């Protein structure tokens, strides 16, 4: 599948709730958990959610993951097997025939366990990223989601059987797989990493409800934050764009033939825009865009002046065709807009969201402006995962508190003795209230997403005495 199509497909998936209660109004996703009081394990880090160094071996996990599919092709690709797996992922835990599924996937998923504990992830795709650009095919990335779905079934079976050590081994495999996705030099890799983590969180929540489940507060606390880094993907986007427009010459005048080839290539790149366009919109071909501007000497002169301001020699620009000047200026504008978003990536989520809201959207007539909003959506997805993990830390903190207070819930979060993370989208404590025997934990949606159920996560936690 083309990189651009994969990106939109993955982003669309994040509009769906994750193990929420569908009987409530669609304004929020309610996740109801009935849990037991449970003190922290001794030693505190007995349970972790990523493989420890002592479990690791030298090697490239990516090759290991892909080998899973060659071990059992029918298991992954057979239509009946896929349909059964879809059902097993959503079947109520008590209806799961766990005994039959405890070695689900057999050698293929045991191979995934091995791969997740190799120490040097390398997707070996950088050269193709430079040459193929937006046409880059990403079948390996999509297959990782299939692998995660299969691991989820085994995870659920282990939870249903009360085999917590085995279940946490599978959780480690899934969390490691998601982290390895962030080593992929595309934002799609990071998005799939977020998606895989959310796939793992469903069975993890089910495990918390099982009698005797160990408390995972410190396991969740010791996860890297952010769990899925976007650094490699953001760098890859810069490489990709530079490769796509390498024929846009800024050092010498371009011939008519060179310009025509470049314009045709730009139209190919902009095909991604048509995915979101509504029928009936006017022609937005690059040629049409240029023809509307090259006759206006004022526009061309202004473009040339902006290029001079960023360091291009004016005497050289005066020898360039008007189309070349306009395209160079449009690329300059795109890079400025792109970096206004990219520079926010490693800020705390609430700061990034606040500053992103102040960014002026690209002008409707901008040739490449459509590429920038996707960056904001990817950062938003990363923040939502951060919020979900932080909420789970709160759930486990409630279990810690209840274990020390005869099964009672705290009236306020300030009564909890362990550190609690702030809501990533506000930089403030999560919303919390107690209604009888039920604690309500709510995350605040990012600005503009107040009516989206997938952005309004509400945990209802009942402590079982």
Residue ranges, per PLM feature:
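N-terminal secretory signal peptides that target proteins for export/translocation
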Residues: 1-2
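Short acidic linear motifs
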Residues: 8, 18-465
């Amino acid at each position: 599948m083309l990189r651009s199509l994969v990106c939109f497909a993955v982003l669309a998936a994040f509009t769906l709730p994750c193990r929420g209660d569908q009987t409530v109004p669609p304004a929020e996703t309610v996740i109801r958990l009935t849990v037991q009081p449970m003190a922290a394990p001794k030693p505190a880090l007995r349970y972790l959610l990523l493989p420890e160094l002592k479990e690791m071996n030298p090697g490239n996990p990516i090759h290991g993951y892909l080998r899973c599919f060659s071990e059992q092709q029918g298991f992954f690709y057979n239509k009946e097997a896929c349909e059964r797996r879809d059902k097993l992922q959503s079947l109520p835990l008590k209806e799961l025939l766990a005994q039959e599924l405890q070695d689900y996937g057999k050698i293929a998923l045991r191979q995934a366990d091995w791969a997740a504990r190799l120490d040097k992830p390398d997707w070996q795709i950088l050269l193709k990223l430079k040459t193929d650009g937006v046409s880059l095919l990403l079948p390996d990335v999509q297959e990782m989601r299939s692998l995660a779905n299969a691991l989820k079934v085994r995870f659920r079976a282990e939870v249903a059987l009360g085999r917590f050590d085995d279940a946490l081994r599978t959780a480690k495999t899934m969390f490691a797989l998601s982290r390895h996705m962030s080593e992929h030099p595309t934002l799609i890799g990071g998005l799939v990493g977020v998606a895989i983590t959310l796939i793992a969180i469903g069975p993890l929540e089910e495990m918390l409800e099982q009698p005797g489940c160990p408390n995972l507060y410190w396991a969740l606390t010791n996860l890297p934050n952010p769990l899925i880094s976007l650094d490699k993907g953001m760098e890859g986007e810069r490489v990709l764009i530079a490769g796509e427009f390498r024929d846009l010459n800024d050092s010498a005048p371009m011939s008519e033939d060179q310009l025509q080839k470049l314009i045709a290539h730009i139209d190919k790149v902009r095909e991604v825009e048509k995915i979101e366009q509504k029928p009936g919109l006017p022609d937005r071909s690059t040629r049409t865009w240029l023809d509307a501007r090259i006759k206006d000497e004022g526009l061309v002169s202004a473009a040339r002046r902006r290029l001079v301001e960023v360091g291009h020699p004016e005497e050289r620009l005066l020898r360039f065709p008007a189309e070349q000047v306009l395209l160079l200026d449009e690329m300059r504008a795109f890079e400025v807009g792109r970096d206004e978003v990219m520079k926010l990536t490693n800020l705390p989520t609430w700061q990034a969201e606040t500053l992103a809201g102040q960014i002026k959207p690209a002008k409707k007539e901008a040739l490449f402006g459509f590429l920038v909003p996707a960056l904001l959506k990817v950062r938003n997805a990363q923040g939502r995962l951060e919020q979900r993990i932080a909420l789970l830390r709160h759930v486990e903190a409630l279990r810690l508190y209840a274990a020390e207070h005869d099964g009672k819930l705290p009236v306020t979060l300030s009564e909890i003795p362990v550190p609690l993370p702030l809501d990533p989208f506000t930089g403030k404590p999560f919303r919390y209230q107690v209604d009888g025997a039920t604690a309500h934990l709510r995350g605040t949606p990012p600005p503009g997403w107040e009516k989206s159920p997938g952005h309004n996560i509400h945990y209802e936690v009942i402590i079982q005495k």
